[in-house]
């Protein structure tokens, strides 16, 4: 039996999740929703994906352009087993009563507060916690990036301090900024630390800045260790951690630009880099402190987590079988 999946919201995350669903042999994409007939809606239709209006109020927008929709979100909910809510932050919580009324499982994204779901999720860290659940929240791109690497070294970590250098906007976003400033998040610590703690029990504090770039986030991480660990140990751990890749400055990876170019060279859709990129040379140990720097492709690192969450919620596979299946289907390198 294939799980019937709907995607509510077909923007940066939604269209990538929808694509990923089509690559699974145990899932079926039933349809997606849009609020207006923009180029993404037309492209979905060209791909043969049924397009639904996000609500009745948006139907006139489609009728005005002669764009025939398959129905509304409520109609889509009647046909699916699960809905992946990829709407803007805060909208998912407002949509939850619709999903509850329809008796449909739902996955929310990191823009929602943790209490929208029964569990916050990163597959390699807490897959089992989502088994059989009705509502799961896949944490944000930044939180996913932190959890991926920190969960791998958690047994050695006493306290984590991380500085988040966040991209200002996604490449197709013309509404956000800044374009000529560095904007600190003056609420210290930032929300990222507590968000990590919704997935793994770890002592962590974070600070954040927004900088004028669209490509990736960068994290500068310092870990106070409670157990001895060498640089080579950390390199070995990360080399054997799924969805984490080591990049070397000596091989030309001296910025996020080259890392994104690497993703383009893989010929992946939308130059997705599902893996967290760690600069190998940045891994260092001074006394009882571990340092490393990582980059996060904010448009795509959460996509495999959404797929694994679906499998966990329907208990289709155990943790590593699901991760391996997702990795293979999306061409994830390890």
Swiss-Prot record:
Keyword NAD: yes
Compartments reported by the entry: Cytoplasm
Alphabetized SUPFAM superfamilies for the sequence: Glyceraldehyde-3-phosphate dehydrogenase-like, C-terminal domain (SSF55347), NAD(P)-binding Rossmann-fold domains (SSF51735)
Positions with a binding annotation for D-glyceraldehyde 3-phosphate: 140-142, 192-193
Record text on subunit structure and interactions: Homotetramer.
EC number(s) from the headed UniProt entry: 1.2.1.59
Family matches, as InterPro entries: DapB_N, GlycerAld/Erythrose_P_DH, GlycerAld_3-P_DH_AS, GlycerAld_3-P_DH_cat, GlycerAld_3-P_DH_NAD(P)-bd, Glyceraldehyde-3-P_DH_2_arc, NAD(P)-bd_dom_sf
GO CC terms in record: cytoplasm
One GO-annotated biological process of the protein: glycolytic process
Top EC class of this enzyme: oxidoreductase
KW ATP-binding (keyword) present: no
Organism annotation: Pyrococcus horikoshii (strain ATCC 700860 / DSM 12428 / JCM 9974 / NBRC 100139 / OT-3)
Protein's name in the database: Glyceraldehyde-3-phosphate dehydrogenase
Pathway note: Carbohydrate degradation; glycolysis; pyruvate from D-glyceraldehyde 3-phosphate: step 1/5
Catalytic reaction equation(s): D-glyceraldehyde 3-phosphate + phosphate + NADP(+) = (2R)-3-phospho-glyceroyl phosphate + NADPH + H(+); D-glyceraldehyde 3-phosphate + phosphate + NAD(+) = (2R)-3-phospho-glyceroyl phosphate + NADH + H(+)
Active-site residues, as the UniProt record annotates them: 141
Chain residues that bind NAD(+): 12-13, 111, 167, 298
